[in-house]
Design a protein with these regions (language model features):
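Active-site metal-binding core of divalent-cation-utilizing nuclease and nuclease-like domains
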Residues: 377-401, 405-410
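Active-site beta-strand-loop-beta-strand hairpin of nuclease catalytic cores
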Residues: 405-425
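A short, highly charged nucleic-acid-interacting micro-segment common to nuclease
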Residues: 342-364, 433-439
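Short, solvent-exposed loop/turn segments at secondary-structure junctions
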Residues: 382-384, 421, 485-488
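A structural signal for isolated positions on well-ordered beta-strands in alpha/beta enzyme cores
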Residues: 402, 414, 478-480
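Catalytic cores of nucleic-acid endonucleases
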Residues: 420-482
């Protein structure tokens, strides 16, 4: 079952069996033996080196196979599968439930199709030779297998860099194996499932419309005409989804249509193109998932066919890319680098970059107001009684405090920094956050230590601002992070990170990070993991 239809949309299923002997039992195993020896090791550094070698092996196999594909029609077959994947995603948003085995693989399947398509930009293609669909299908299936293991080992490596001694490696009957240590795989799986609901959070709904308006204002174009001419030109030649166009005509036509310069229109379109000049290597595509030089952000796949530059643009791909740019780049001061040559677009990006923390903070503030928690927001100084000067904290070594919130009943004060992070869905992205939080920890710790020693300052501030009639000098101070979307730091950070959906319950004390119970059959005991889950040894009780 390699190729099926779901609501008339074709999709590949992941298949191990045709390739496991070639690429794993023989290929990878022999490669690791030749490079590292016939080894069993639990040593963290040795395991990391071997995981990186596995990643390298599958990248090389993927690259070798794809560089052999020099027919344009092969990449058109992949393109049509990718178009179908976008259609299926749209159906999912409307409520379509994919079969469980398809649903779990679907996000990675879409990434691998994009990875394959991006490589076409590196290859001198020809339309003068063809390839049969079944043969192309077999190659696509093989690339899907290889791409899956590229992503898998990138994830293994990322987790291993975040968790001390996450994995061990060994050989079983001359076949290489890699496994989690300490039940971490099952633990991580349960945590991801438990916190999956936390992805259902708010986003900047106005960002897409604002982006389109900024494009019109700064490139002096009509956005609908800019995008609308692409299907018109395609249909002039044929009604095929995979009809290509010559990209040079787009800025010329739009400049004439909008009475603006071709410099403006060329900058706009070049920011939407992925080409040989700007595409990433296979390694960087996988390890830098938020780079703007990827097909997810650049919908115009541009390559050379028989010495002519052509662009392949999907019917729904521009809309997908614009949504991703609006939701997952501009708030983090990123956009297509060509657009950064336009001062107005830079100004727009900087404005959105300054807004994103405020958007999250506004939502958090609503929670505190609704639940009548005394709180301070964006505090740079504390008001004092009896005419005393304010106490400043926006100084070197401390800095503005995003939130302080008080729960009288629990005799607890929470001091928090707010982090509006990109949405992350695998360990490669999580690791970026994990590294960043190392710096955030030092800052929030300094603020917590200061506040713990200066509760009288906060006491007077709250009396002035909220007229509280109770003392807080014996309250416990807890440092936490408020975040918009789940990330691995939540599970293993020094300080707890609370998503928007759980802030109310955490502050009021009705929810906390759960204890995870796992069964250890080999030692006939139950293991109990608590936060931080991957840093503390679990407690154990024997089977009854």
């Amino acid at each position: 079952m390699a190729h099926i239809l779901i609501q008339n949309h074709p999709i590949l299923t992941f298949e191990d069996e045709p390739f496991i002997d070639k690429y794993w039992n023989a290929g990878l195993s022999e490669f690791i033996i030749s490079k590292h020896g016939y080894i069993t090791t639990y040593d963290h550094n040795e395991v990391e080196e071997i995981l990186l070698s596995c990643f390298e092996y599958f990248v090389d196999q993927f690259r070798t196979l794809i560089l052999q594909q020099d027919t344009e029609i092969f990449f058109h077959y992949v393109f049509l599968l990718h178009e179908a994947s976008i259609d299926l995603y749209i159906e999912q948003l409307k409520g379509l439930q994919l079969p469980d085995d398809i649903d779990s693989d679907f996000p990675r399947y879409c990434r691998i199709l994009k990875l394959i398509l991006e490589q076409s930009c590196d290859i001198e293609l020809t339309a003068k030779r063809s390839i049969g669909y079944q043969k192309a299908l077999n190659i696509m299936q093989e690339l899907y297998y290889l791409g899956n293991w590229i992503y898998e080992f990138s994830i293994y490596t990322a987790y291993h860099k975040m968790i001390p001694s996450a994995y061990f490696v060994e050989f079983e009957e001359n076949v290489f194996t890699c496994r989690w240590q300490n039940n971490y795989g099952e633990l991580n799986k349960l945590l991801l499932k438990y916190f999956s609901i936390d992805y259902e959070t708010f986003f900047d709904e106005a960002a897409l419309d604002e982006l389109k308006q900024a494009i019109e204002d700064n490139f002096f174009i009509d956005y609908k005409k800019a995008i609308g001419q692409i299907p018109i030109i395609k249909k002039h030649f044929s009604n095929r989804q995979n009809q290509t166009i010559e990209p040079y005509v787009l800025p010329i036509n739009l400049a004439a249509e909008c009475n603006t310069s071709e410099d403006n229109t060329w900058l706009f379109y070049s920011g939407l193109m992925i080409t040989k000049a700007n595409k990433l290597s296979i390694e960087d595509t996988v390890l830098k998932p938020h780079s703007e030089k990827r097909y997810i952000f650049r919908p115009m796949l541009t390559y050379i066919v028989d010495d002519v530059e052509r662009s392949l643009v999907g019917d729904n791909k521009v809309a997908e890319s614009m949504m991703v740019i609006a939701s997952n780049t501009i708030h983090w001061n990123t956009m297509p680098e060509e657009w950064l040559q336009n001062k107005g677009m830079v100004k727009f990006m900087n404005k959105k970059g300054l807004e994103h923390d405020r958007l999250l903070e506004n939502e958090i503030e609503k929670i505190f107001i609704t639940n009548k928690f005394p709180y301070c927001r964006n505090t740079k100084s504390f008001k004092q009684k009896n005419g005393k000067s304010n106490v400043k904290v926006d100084i070197q070594g401390l800095g503005e405090i995003d939130f302080i919130v008080v729960n009288k009943d629990r005799k607890k004060i929470f001091i928090s920094d707010t982090k509006y992070n990109r949405a992350r869905y695998d360990a490669v992205g999580y690791r970026t956050d994990y590294t960043n939080f190392g710096g955030y920890e030092m800052k929030i710790e300094a603020k917590k230590n200061w506040l713990s020693k200066n509760l009288q300052v906060l006491q007077e501030h709250l009396e002035v601002m909220f007229h509280i009639d109770y003392g807080i000098l014996d309250f416990e101070v807890e440092a936490i992070f408020f975040i918009n979307t789940p990330t691995f730091y939540m599970f293993n950070g020094k300080y707890k990170a609370i998503t928007l959906t759980r802030i109310k319950e955490y502050v009021e004390g009705s929810w906390d990070y759960p204890t995870i119970k796992l069964k250890d059959d080999s030692n006939k005991q139950f293991l109990y993991y608590t936060h931080p889950y991957f840093s503390k040894a679990p407690t154990a009780t024997a089977f009854e």
